[in-house]
């Protein structure tokens, strides 16, 4: 008997609903359970999603449910919480931790033994506490981390160079937030080092400063939120891409929030790094070379992670 790919999503707001739609449109799962603090919303989204069935790559079953239904899933996506205009992601911490405490221990107690994928901000910190609350191995608790930020960097570099973003390899590292850094020194365009490409194409980079491009990536979320009150499409695709890599055992290198255990000289917390993603979740973290500026920026981001983990611990949710 073929195995059914089952996904649960907790938190069906702008982000959760678009994660659901992205996974359905890409044929990532066969069964989906939606859960929200407002049950009527989850039910309505489930019906709305079912109305897309005749347009999907293959048949899928979508329904609303609770803890017992979620416990039977292979992957649970956590997208609870909200972000308002001008709010720093780290200012969401207490509310986000209270939200995950309300269901993570219960779904594990009910028998869930799959993989958690966290989107809820501040994602690196929340992912850390999802692991603490669940007691799961570090590889089976993953955050979307700098996955979307890296996609934004690739888009911006594509706009500057007029080259397809799919042949650009470039990563944002560290916090999914204001201290993230662009790893320009390891970036490539179809195998050509990005910094070498800059030197041989000075006309394309006239007046372009890498520090400005980096800040543009960081500002993108706030610009979107300022205009439409939320981000949803990009993160929906980021989540879908990550879940697909798990289900298909793709062993793709994807930027995500992964638990450091000596990599990059750090241990004991989650942050945005490239990792090999397969059926076991995070199979391996890849360590990219960092220049002096990038190393300092990464160290600063790690300091932020450690600081806010301590803040999170002060709330005594575990």
UniProtKB/Swiss-Prot annotation:
UniProt EC number = 1.1.1.27
Which positions, given as ranges, span the membrane? none
Write out the entry's keywords from A to Z: Cytoplasm, NAD, Oxidoreductase
| Catalytic residue positions | 176 (proton acceptor)
Matching CDD domains, A to Z?
HicDH_like
> Quick one: which residues bind NAD(+)?
15, 36, 41, 102, 119-121, 144
Localization, UniProt: Cytoplasm
Name the pathway it acts in.
Answer: Fermentation; pyruvate fermentation to lactate; (S)-lactate from pyruvate: step 1/1
So which residues are the signal peptide here?
none
GO terms assigned for molecular function: L-lactate dehydrogenase activity
The protein's matches in SUPFAM superfamilies, at most eight in alphabetical order, are given as: LDH C-terminal domain-like (SSF56327), NAD(P)-binding Rossmann-fold domains (SSF51735)
Q: Does the keyword Hydrolase apply?
A: no
Gene Ontology terms: biological process: glycolytic process; lactate metabolic process; pyruvate metabolic process
Can you state which reaction this protein catalyses?
A: (S)-lactate + NAD(+) = pyruvate + NADH + H(+)
**InterPro entries documented for this protein:** L-lactate/malate_DH, L-lactate_DH, L-lactate_DH_AS, Lactate/malate_DH_C, Lactate/malate_DH_N, Lactate_DH/Glyco_Ohase_4_C, NAD(P)-bd_dom_sf
Amino acids binding substrate: 89, 121-124, 149-152, 231
Q: Which domain of life is it from?
A: Bacteria
Any Gene Ontology CC annotation: cytoplasm
Similarity comment = Belongs to the LDH/MDH superfamily. LDH family.
The record's annotation in NCBIfam families points to: L-LDH-NAD (TIGR01771)
Q: What does this protein do?
A: Catalyzes the conversion of lactate to pyruvate.
Q: Its quaternary structure?
A: Homotetramer.
Protein name per its UniProtKB record: L-lactate dehydrogenase
The species this protein belongs to is Fusobacterium nucleatum subsp. nucleatum (strain ATCC 25586 / DSM 15643 / BCRC 10681 / CIP 101130 / JCM 8532 / KCTC 2640 / LMG 13131 / VPI 4355)
At the highest ranks, the source species' classification is: Bacteria, Fusobacteriati, Fusobacteriota, Fusobacteriia, Fusobacteriales
């Amino acid at each position: 008997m073929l195995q059914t790919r089952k996904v649960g999503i907790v938190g069906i707001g702008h982000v959760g609903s678009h994660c659901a739609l992205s996974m359905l449109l890409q044929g990532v799962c066969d069964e989906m359970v939606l859960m929200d603090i407002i049950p009527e919303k989850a039910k309505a989204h489930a019906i709305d999603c079912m109305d897309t069935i005749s347009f999907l790559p293959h048949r899928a079953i979508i329904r609303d449910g609770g803890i017992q239904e979620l416990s039977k899933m292979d992957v649970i996506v956590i997208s609870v919480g909200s972000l308002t205009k001008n709010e720093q992601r780290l200012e969401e911490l207490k509310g986000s931790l209270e939200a995950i405490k309300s269901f993570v221990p219960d779904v594990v107690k009910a028998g869930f033994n799959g993989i958690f994928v966290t989107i809820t901000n501040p994602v690196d910190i929340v992912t850390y506490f999802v692991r603490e609350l669940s007691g799961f191995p570090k590889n089976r608790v993953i955050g979307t981390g700098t996955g979307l930020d890296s996609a934004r960097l690739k888009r911006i570099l594509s706009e500057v160079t007029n080259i397809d973003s799919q042949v650009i390899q470039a990563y944002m590292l560290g916090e999914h937030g204001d201290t993230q850094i662009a790893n320009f020194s390891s970036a490539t365009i179809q195998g050509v080092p990005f910094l070498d490409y800059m030197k041989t194409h000075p006309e394309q980079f006239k007046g372009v400063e890498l520090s400005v491009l980096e800040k543009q990536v960081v500002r993108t979320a706030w610009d979107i939120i300022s205009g439409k009150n939320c981000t949803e499409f990009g993160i929906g695709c980021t989540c879908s891409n990550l879940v697909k890599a798990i289900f298909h055992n793709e062993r793709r290198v994807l930027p995500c929030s992964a638990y450091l255990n000596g990599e990059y000289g750090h241990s004991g917390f989650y942050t945005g790094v490239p990792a090999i993603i397969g059926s076991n979740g995070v199979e391996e973290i890849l360590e990219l070379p960092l220049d002096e500026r990038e190393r300092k920026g990464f160290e600063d981001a790690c300091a932020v992670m450690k600081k806010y983990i301590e803040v999170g611990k002060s709330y005594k949710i575990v």
